[in-house]
Regions:
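Short linear motifs embedded in intrinsically disordered, charge-biased segments
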Residues: 1-178
Length: 178
């Protein structure tokens, strides 16, 4: 373990940590396996970060989307295969609130509008764009499907801590008055 590169993050009352007399640097967030972990366990930062990464991928594919040689269904498949997975990485553990849901819907429609090269000033309804693309299932629907698949995966496991936590069967007694 290299002390100069090692940092700690604590979600409890621990404020500092010493190893061999040297205090370790404390951080409030870090990226672990591609996901942003914060001390307050709020996933809104991670959702915003993922949406920004999706925007970067979408803008890098701009030359493909402007090409007249590629058909619209191929472009739609390209978005679903390259942009959406970048955004949805780790979405099974997200707690999506109303504000994040609106951001996700806005991102999906931004992708489709960029695909059609419809400027934001154009008076074209979102429904007409969705009707023309006919994506089948919305971005939010895909995320819900992934969450349910993960939940089913957890429930099929025989003796796992995750299943016990999800079902609320922790073997302890409640304190009086709780």
């Amino acid at each position: 373990m290299k002390r100069s590169n090692t940092k700690i993050m604590a979600s409890g009352p621990i404020t500092s940590w010493e190893i061999d007399g040297k205090t370790m640097e404390t951080v409030s967030d870090f990226i672990f396996l591609g996901s942003k972990i914060t001390t307050d366990n709020d996933c809104s930062h991670e959702i915003k970060r993922r949406l920004l990464l999706g925007r970067k991928v979408m803008t890098k594919l701009d030359s493909i989307f402007k090409s007249r040689d590629i058909t619209l269904p191929t472009k739609v498949h390209q978005v679903k295969a390259t942009v959406f997975p970048v955004v949805m990485y780790g979405c099974e553990s997200w707690t999506v609130k109303k504000a994040e849901r609106q951001r996700i819907d806005a991102f999906e429609l931004w992708c489709w509008r960029k695909l059609f090269r419809v400027p934001w000033t154009a008076r074209r309804s979102n429904q007409s764009i969705l009707k023309e693309i006919s994506p089948g299932i919305s971005f939010e629907g895909i995320m819900l499907k992934l969450k349910l698949q993960y939940f089913g995966h957890l429930m099929r496991r025989v003796d796992s801590l995750e299943k016990t936590l999800m079902l609320g069967r922790i073997g302890s007694r409640r304190r009086r008055g709780w």
